[in-house]
Amino acid sequence: MEITLDSPLDMHLHLRDGDMLRLVAPLSADFAGAVIMPNLVPPVTGAAALQAYSERIDTAMGGIPFTRLMTLFFKSYSAAELESARALPEFFGIKLYPAGITTNSEGGLADMAAAAPTLHLMEDMGIPLLVHGESHGFVMDREAEFLPIYRRLAQRFPKLRICMEHITTTAALHLLEEHENLCATVTLQHLLITLDDVVGGSMQPHLFCKPIAKREEDRAALLRAALSGHPRLMFGSDSAPHPQHKKECCGCAAGVFTAPLALPRLAALFAEHGAADKLQDFVSGNACRLYHLHPVPRRITLRDTPMRIPAAYRSYGQRVVPMHAGETLSWSIVPTAAG
């Protein structure tokens, strides 16, 4: 069996910087493009920094055509600052992190009320808002506690396109139905695992991420929604590489590295459930329609032949362990013929 995808997009990707960027950028290029997260150190907070980071990504891709949908880290922006960013062809939107909620988010928003002036400007200019929607409460309840904020944002800014990133709960799916200006991304890991897979037996640090994996009923609901072809649900890997020594330690970093295997694993999942025809919209069609995107043309063919995942990816002094490390997947990408 084969599945052919046109210009798949990853609507939530971490590429990091420096040597880590040089390692993971080509490994993320099975997709035709991606929304790139801005939580570097220091974060990407202006047009010049955004353009410079985009150019570093382009260099790291080594000539692979790749649509870079770049984001700014949310802060108070003036109209002039937003216009400068909007003038860049690679600018996509602004990512809001509650302060301290995830990797390199210490400079995130501490007072949601203070966001209103910038959000009004974004609404007027048609700039999408992307949100890591978690509170600082009990870890299993953080997304649920943030949902009322999503609701208020959707009501107060009805023309603002708001993306609830990496949703993990049935409750978030219910909220998605309430407001047409809400959309959402879902990760591979949250379609596959629950908290029990992370900590139910031996601790599995390479499955630990934020938002944390939830209960089986949540995973099943997310999968049903993805398989159904929901028009405002998109794939966003949240592929988040960390050096192996920062994952296999006390106080390990949060993040699952899935970029090199995401498309074959999704193909297997959708085919297994008789929904191969829904995969195109999940990994590209919905995003292109919602955001009027035109990624570089790329045709990817996947086939139900085995693919071995390495124990780690290493180069430039970096070593990153992926999800499914050392395992054999049932689907793989068909190599493109040279010439």
Named regions from a protein language model:
Residues 1, 267-339:
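Active-site microenvironment of metallo-dependent hydrolases
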Residues 9-11, 23-49, 63-75, 91-104, ...:
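Divalent metal-dependent hydrolysis catalytic cores, especially in the metallo-beta-lactamase
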Residues 15-17, 40-42, 74-76, 98-100, ...:
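Active-site-proximal loop/turn and secondary-structure-junction residues that shape catalytic pockets
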Residues 18-25, 77-88:
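Short, acidic/polar
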Residues 80-96, 104-235:
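Histidine/acidic residue-rich metal-binding segments in metalloenzymes
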